[in-house]
Amino acid sequence: MTRKPRNESSWFDIAKSVALALLLAIGIRTALAKPFHVPSPSMEPTLLIGDYMLASKFAYGYSRHSLPLSLGGFSGRLFERPVARGDIVVFKLPRDPRGDYVKRVIGLPGDRVQVAGGVLHINGAAVAIGRIADFQSIGDGQPLRTPRHVETLPGGVRHEILHASQMGTLDDTPEFVVPPGHYFVMGDDRSNSLDSRVPAGMGGVDFVPAENLVGRVDFRHLSVDPEWRWSAPSTWLKALRFERIGGVG
């Protein structure tokens, strides 16, 4: 019986360990959680550009969109679990399943949703809101202040929203009736979000089919100020927003 040379055996062990690590990472990404980062300000102030999160895939069960590249020859959801109003979800657009989108669930199947005079109404009742301190940010190098409110959804979920003082086209909408097996989603920055208020033909989200949900956003594991630069090492540590790491609501 011949033994493998020690160097050959060592390289084989390393390759095997790397392969097992890759398989484990793929398995976790496929079955448990999907990493996701925020590319736009539509969910401010809850989620900021530069936030990195994990979306729990088992929260709602599994669909073909739970798999990488939306592969899979089945429809609907396996081990389906209910979606709660107020959940922050990652989903795929029916017209373009390549990208990931993140919004908050506002309307459940059968709900009537409308925005009138800038106030959200669900099933004919205005949602309670209360003004709090303005949200401060930077835009084009200049400080910005945006009116911020706390909104309380039916069921008791409280979360912050932004709403610019001036009324826009998204502040007065028709009444939407959420179809069976679909959800109505909105961004927390109500004046800066192409969401279910906007038809798909106009670049919006429209209603989101249940099978297009990828997962629920539960945890933020990293947050980096987008103003940091590789060329300026002095900004590296300052760019890490440690206070934002943790649960997402």
Regions found by a protein language model. Give the residues of each.
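Soluble "head" domains of membrane/secretory-pathway proteins
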Residues: 2-12, 27, 31-37, 42-249
